[in-house]
A protein has these predicted regions:
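Eukaryotic modular interaction domains in large regulatory/scaffold proteins
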Residues: 146-199, 203
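EF-hand Ca2+-binding helix-loop-helix modules
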Residues: 2-69, 75-76, 91-100, 105-156, ...
């Protein structure tokens, strides 16, 4: 792996590694120029219960396309999902998205990974150069929730460079906690939860994975549901 990043390396950390990451970054920067409807991190926190509720409604979509019922969506099932939802991505784009969101490298997306993938698709369909259908992802009820997640990232990314830095996270938390002594620790904890690759910068995908955990959605939700179903039947 690469060496530890030094203080002056933030610009290097922000360079996208793949064509998909470059496209996500470009689309996010364009979206950030429009600003956020959220006024503070606290206003986002107040939306957590509703966001959690709406994301869990996505479970039915997940189960519909998990045709073999193994609790994960594989590449073939994702291709079928995109065709059914009329998401007009190329095979290369679909493969890249699958690889990007299959963070466990087990050739199957769990529920939380599927949510992240759909939200990335929602963002990418904001590309004015793309000729797509009226509903971005064929799931209009979920799109308002995804827009809130995009709004949240835009709120945090004060300098609109497509990444959230440690300083920006501290600033957002400080605005919420009104100078409480614990605010710095809270901000650092939240940032560390987001910064998976420890490069000091958080991209939109990292933010989404952290956010699903914040609202209570984990990658083992399917297993917990199965256990719960079994107990009820007994």
């Amino acid at each position: 792996m690469g060496g530890t990043l030094q203080k002056g390396d933030s610009s290097r950390a922000s360079l996208p590694e793949t064509k998909l990451e470059a496209k996500i970054l470009e689309t996010m920067r364009r979206r950030e120029s429009e600003g956020s409807s959220l006024k503070s991190f606290n206003s986002l926190i107040l939306k957590f219960p509703k966001i959690d509720e709406n994301l869990r409604k996505c479970k039915a979509v997940f189960e519909e396309f998990d045709t073999d019922g193994n609790g994960a969506i594989d590449q073939q099932e994702l291709n079928h999902c995109f065709r059914k939802l009329e998401i007009g991505f190329t095979e290369e784009e679909t493969n890249d998205l699958f690889e990007a969101c299959d963070i466990n490298d087990d050739r199957g997306m769990k529920f939380n990974e599927f949510i992240v993938l759909l939200c990335l698709v929602y963002l990418l369909k904001d590309d004015p150069a793309a000729q797509h259908a009226k509903s971005r992802i064929g799931l209009p009820n979920l799109e308002a929730t995804f827009e809130t997640l995009v709004d949240a990232f835009v709120l945090l990314d004060k300098n609109k460079d497509g990444h959230v830095s440690k300083r920006e996270m501290v600033e957002a938390i400080n605005e919420t906690t009104s100078g409480e002594r614990s605010s710095g620790r809270i901000a650092m904890k939240r940032f560390e939860e987001m910064d998976w690759d420890k490069n000091g910068m958080v991209n939109f995908k990292e933010f989404l994975f952290a956010f699903t955990r914040w609202v209570g959605i984990e990658d083992n939700d399917d297993e917990e549901d199965d256990e719960g179903d079994g107990e009820e039947e007994g």
